[in-house]
Amino acid sequence: MGDHAWSFLKDFLAGGVAAAVSKTAVAPIERVKLLLQVQHASKQISAEKQYKGIIDCVVRIPKEQGFLSFWRGNLANVIRYFPTQALNFAFKDKYKQLFLGGVDRHKQFWRYFAGNLASGGAAGATSLCFVYPLDFARTRLAADVGKGAAQREFHGLGDCIIKIFKSDGLRGLYQGFNVSVQGIIIYRAAYFGVYDTAKGMLPDPKNVHIFVSWMIAQSVTAVAGLVSYPFDTVRRRMMMQSGRKGADIMYTGTVDCWRKIAKDEGAKAFFKGAWSNVLRGMGGAFVLVLYDEIKKYV
């Protein structure tokens, strides 16, 4: 094995451990966020049983479903990391060459900006093609509020994928795919635009203290996450459609989903669980910083 391949494998495995630790640590926040996002589209949660907010959700989950249910869907989320990273690594440079070859960042800023969006969107869409069923299963497992085996809609990752595939075919596992790609592009546009602006405002962008860099990254991630959050809400709601038939189908398509959420629930509904998303990002970053510190002594 060459040095390059060995280096990639080490980073890949170390990153996988870090991802597993950080995702597992913030999984309860992630589940709260997902439940707040999709409860209106859930057959299991009637109007009177809907969660009133983050605190209500955190208090009721262990009471109604057991403490370990905070980690429902986490395995799919951890597994998803490995193919996503491998695919990103495989496609990233190819898309950069295609969209950014010969573009000067300083002299052709807007072309560079557009190329960055295109390469990020293309790389994201390519890896999503392969890992989307895992993301789908993670959402459906997290949204499953049944307590015992008899009340659960799905009994695990494999059961979820098989049931939906039998019911709706491959299309059922890719509900909300289009809006997911749109969300990636919007996220990258916000992230790239805000990050560059923030760094450009510093007196010496090349010599920035690690804490300042971390604060900028946190702020930019939070802003980009909020800007693209409505797309995430719509895609999760679309995921909840799979396996439904006839009158049970709430949304006829993505456009109908946008329209009905705005009309029936108001614009605020697009941002349900957004605050927990910000907390999750901070928690994940903290765990990764901790992991880097531990790695120094191992």
From Swiss-Prot:
One of its GO terms (biological process) is positive regulation of mitophagy. Its main location: mitochondrion. The modification Phosphoserine is found at S7. One of its GO terms (molecular function) is ATP:ADP antiporter activity. The matrix-open state (m-state) is inhibited by the membrane-permeable bongkrekic acid (BKA). The cytoplasmic-open state (c-state) is inhibited by the membrane-impermeable toxic inhibitor carboxyatractyloside (CATR). Proton transporter activity is inhibited by ADP:ATP antiporter activity. Changing R235G: In MTDPS12A; severely decreased function in ADP transport. Changing A114P: In PEOA2; decreased function in ADP transport; inverted direction of ADP:ATP transport, with ATP entering the mitochondrial matrix. Gene3D superfamilies: Mitochondrial carrier domain (1.50.40.10). Keywords: Acetylation, Antiport, Cardiomyopathy, Disease variant, Host-virus interaction, Membrane, Methylation, Mitochondrion, Mitochondrion inner membrane, Phosphoprotein, Primary mitochondrial disease, Progressive external ophthalmoplegia, Repeat, S-nitrosylation, Transmembrane, Transmembrane helix, Transport. It comes from the Eukaryota. ADP:ATP antiporter that mediates import of ADP into the mitochondrial matrix for ATP synthesis, and export of ATP out to fuel the cell. Cycles between the cytoplasmic-open state (c-state) and the matrix-open state (m-state): operates by the alternating access mechanism with a single substrate-binding site intermittently exposed to either the cytosolic (c-state) or matrix (m-state) side of the inner mitochondrial membrane. In addition to its ADP:ATP antiporter activity, also involved in mitochondrial uncoupling and mitochondrial permeability transition pore (mPTP) activity. This is ADP/ATP translocase 1.
